A protein has these predicted regions:
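Core AdoMet radical
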Residues: 51-73, 77-98, 102-127, 131-165, ...
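Active-site phosphate/pyrophosphate- and oxyanion-stabilizing loops and adjacent acidic/basic residues
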Residues: 17, 104, 231
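Active-site-proximal loop/turn and secondary-structure-junction residues that shape catalytic pockets
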Residues: 34-36, 91-93, 118-122, 140-142, ...
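N-terminal small/glycine-rich loop or linker at the start of catalytic domains
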Residues: 29-60, 145, 163, 167-174, ...
Length: 331
């Protein structure tokens, strides 16, 4: 991009907002990725926290979360009105049957099918109605650049998996990270990918520069750049579900991303932010877009009892999540 036209960007955002309102996108969801493990057998994506952990984890089984802890988190999300963005885990952290069992239990807790983001797999036929959709961690839609940032996740294999998912009746999603060094012109690759593979949902994230990665000294993408990408995609794909992630140090992005076409927002530490000034800020950002918020970051009554309402084996984890939510973590 040789020159930046701020007027053009603002016009795109305005058009995207008008389109969103016309489509009835007046409710914004709070989304939470539920992690299964901190181990990834690939462990070489240039930006990823897990890439810094692979050589430190001597026993990968110890990096797996307890299943009851995962299920308790899902129950708390349900109580607070949060959507589960997807189940996420590094390669070879859980078997397909283990993931299926976890998803079945979450489905029974929330009453909703689960999205998966658990890597490239040829075993999609093992899943059933407990799964709503399959997410491909594309990260960068420019094929040549994607090879650099995710060398062990071939884009053609992700694409084949998503096409198979569609054939099996699952919805299809992809994740895209902005701020990796891509150009705005790469949005054309993204358009082509969404169109070619009939993608139902795109989840955008801004780069989080993790220590010990190549991006440690990189900045997060500019808010208007992020907004321009999102508004461009919204205008091109009116029916696409768009989720946008931002970090606690960039909460001011929320409002402009919603106006740019986001249906939901993600990437928040739920139990750390709940009831704090940061949780309130999220709700205020949504309020000033004229949308309503599905779920809460502040209503303590929604936390519910300190015992599980579905399985007593989850009690200790429910109690801990509620206790963590009631602490003021940002004094």
């Amino acid at each position: 991009m040789n020159s930046i036209n701020s007027t053009e960007t603002l016009e795109l955002i305005t058009k995207a907002n008008n389109l969103s309102l016309k489509k009835g996108y007046d409710e914004i969801s709070l989304e939470r990725a539920v992690f299964l493990s901190w181990w990834c057998d690939k462990g070489d994506c240039k930006f990823c926290y897990m890439s810094t952990q692979k050589n430190k984890i001597k026993d990968p089984t110890k990096a797996k979360r307890r299943v009851n802890n995962i299920l308790a988190e899902a129950e708390m999300c349900s109580r607070l009105g949060w959507n589960i963005e997807f189940l996420s885990g590094g390669y070879k952290s859980f078997t397909t049957q283990e993931i299926k069992s976890i998803a079945e239990n979450i489905h029974s807790i929330t009453g909703d099918g689960v999205w998966l983001n658990t890597g490239i797999t040829s075993e999609l036929k093992e899943y059933g109605t407990e799964i709503k959709g399959i997410t491909g961690a594309v990260e960068a839609a420019n094929p040549e650049f994607q090879k650099i940032v995710c060398p062990s996740k071939p884009l053609d294999q992700i694409s084949d998996m998503l096409d198979t998912a569609g054939d099996l009746g699952f919805k299809k999603a992809i994740t895209i990270i902005l701020g990796l060094g891509e150009s705005f012109e790469d949005v054309e690759y993204l358009k082509d990918y969404i169109r070619e593979h009939k993608i139902d949902r795109v989840i955008f994230y801004s780069l989080n520069p993790h220590p010990e990665t190549e991006y440690v000294n990189s900045s997060q993408p500019a808010s208007l750049y992020y907004a321009k990408v999102v508004s461009t995609i919204r205008l091109e794909f009116p029916d696409l579900e768009i989720i946008c992630g931002t970090w606690t140090d960039n909460l001011a992005n929320i409002g402009i991303l919603i106006l740019s076409g986001a249906n939901g927002i993600t990437k928040f530490p739920l139990f750390k932010m709940f009831g704090t000034k940061y949780g309130k800020r999220v709700e205020e950002e949504v309020k000033w877009t004229g949308r309503t918020l599905k779920g809460t970051f502040t209503d303590k009554s929604k936390l519910g009892p300190e015992k599980s309402e579905v399985n007593p084996e989850l009690d200790q984890y429910i109690k801990r999540y509620i206790k963590d939510s009631l602490k003021n973590k940002y004094k």
